[in-house]
Structures are given as C-alpha cells and as structure tokens.
Regions:
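Active-site HxH/HxHxD metal-binding segment of metal-dependent hydrolases
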Residues: 1-49
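Intrinsic structural disorder
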Residues: 1-4, 8, 21-23, 106, ...
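Glycine-centered flexibility motif
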Residues: 12-13, 27, 42, 80-82, ...
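Short hydrophobic/aromatic-enriched beta-strand-loop microsegments
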Residues: 19-28, 71-73, 130-134
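Prokaryotic Sec-type signal peptides and long signal-anchor helices
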Residues: 21-22, 75, 125, 167
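Residue-level signal for pocket-adjacent positions within structured domains
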Residues: 28, 34, 76-79, 149, ...
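Catalytic core of the metallo-beta-lactamase
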Residues: 31-126
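Accessory terminal helices/loops
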Residues: 97-107, 116-170
Length: 170
C-alpha cells in the first residue's frame, strides 16, 4: 500500500487491509523516504520513484510509476491543488514545480475528483473564460460518460491549472 500522507481520508482503511491481506505499507510518516528513492514492490514488476512533495502536509509524497503514472495524493488535483495545511507555500510551490518538470505525457492520478469544482473556481477568478471553453466541454463529456475525469494528463494541467501557471505573467 502506497500512502501519500497521513490524513484519515487516506489512511482510514489501511489497518483493516493490513490485518486481512498483510501487504507492505510504504509511507513517509512511519519510515523515512528520500526524494528520488526507487522502490521495489514485492511481486510486482513496477518501477516506483518517490517524489517528496511537502506543502499539503509536511510528509506528503507522490509516487511516479514507470516514469509515466503519477499518484499525486493531495498535492495536485485536476485544475487545482491541495490546501496548504503546513502554511509553507514555498514548499507547495516547489512541489508543484517538481511535478511541472515531469514529462508532459505523464498521467496524473489525484486522490480526489474535484476537477469540475476547480474549473468553476478558476473561471470565477480568471476573466478569460474563452480560454477554458474547450476544456470545459471535454470535461462535461468525460464526466457524463464515465463520471470521472481522472486521470488527467499533465499537458492539460500545465495549460489550464492556475496553480501550475502562477509564474505566468498572463
């Protein structure tokens, strides 16, 4: 079990799973993980890289699987990012910058589906609504057909997510 951080909505069922199935649990709050550390998962042929991504919480980590699937917990959401409970906005900015540096084809798997609400927020603060129209149409289609917009592609996040564009003067 790969845990991104120590919030109850992420860890609540872990004890039951561990008691029943006895999996290995990997996290950054009961053990020390390091940025860039490669994990070996028993019985799985996967390459998992640890990315330390503090900001939402101090111990938050993301997991990059096979250099193309990012399990980003509450650091990055579709069209948004997690609340900064640490009050360390520089750490969150650095964590988002680390995600921005990944290949644009990276598939991002946030822990929560907040994309539609985040898009409403973005269009309430960014007057350039036309910029988001195509993505909004795509989002409605995807949410209607499969009821989920995830995973999201980093290309779309780099283009539309205000929190990944905060250094853009426009």
């Amino acid at each position: 079990i790969l845990l991104t951080h120590n919030h109850a909505d992420h860890t609540g069922g872990v004890k039951v799973l561990c008691d029943r199935y006895h999996p290995e649990c990997i996290d950054n709050f009961s053990q020390q993980l390091s940025d860039g550390q490669m994990l070996k998962l028993a019985d799985l042929d996967l390459s998992v890289k640890v990315l330390l991504t503090p900001g939402h919480t101090l111990e938050h980590v993301c997991y990059l699987v096979d250099d193309k699937h990012l399990f980003c917990g509450d650091t990055l959401f579709g069209m948004g990012c997690g609340r900064v409970f640490t009050n360390d906005f520089v750490a969150m900015y650095d964590s988002l910058s680390k995600i921005k540096a990944l290949p644009e084809s990276t598939l991002c798997y946030p822990a929560h589906e907040y994309t539609a609400n985040n898009l409403r927020f973005i269009t309430s603060v960014d007057n350039n609504h036309a910029y988001y129209q195509d993505y909004a149409k795509y989002l409605v289609m995807k949410l209607t057909s499969v009821q989920n917009s995830l995973p999201t592609v980093l290309t779309d996040e780099l283009r539309y997510n205000l929190f990944l564009r905060c250094d853009d003067p426009n």
